[in-house]
């Protein structure tokens, strides 16, 4: 193996300046989700919409009502209890954290 070629100080300085350091990673800013402006008071328009649309849903839960109808979670829970007592929807699974319903069929 041939010996390494000796570089002068000027050549070493030029080589050091040419390479440069790797730049630091730029952390991207997280996109912030806007605060939801859901309804918290049940007016007649919302009630009519709930009574009209919810019986057509195959899967009904609090989160489904919040997403589709733009209502608050507490209002969605009240609406689900009302629809269950009316016989419009029937429970599939109920426990303290999540209640899942489906539409009630006419044969039942």
Curated annotation (Swiss-Prot):
Disulfide bonds: none
Region (Disordered): 1-36
Entries under SUPFAM superfamilies matching the protein: Winged helix' DNA-binding domain
Keywords: Ribonucleoprotein, Ribosomal protein
Biased composition (Basic residues): 21-35
Descriptive protein name: Small ribosomal subunit protein eS25
Biased composition (Low complexity): 1-20
Pfam families: Ribosomal_S25
Leader peptide range in chain numbering: none
GO CC aspect terms: cytosolic small ribosomal subunit
Example GO molecular function: structural constituent of ribosome
Domain of life: Eukaryota
Homology family: Belongs to the eukaryotic ribosomal protein eS25 family.
InterPro entries associated with the record: Ribosomal_eS25, WH_DNA-bd_sf
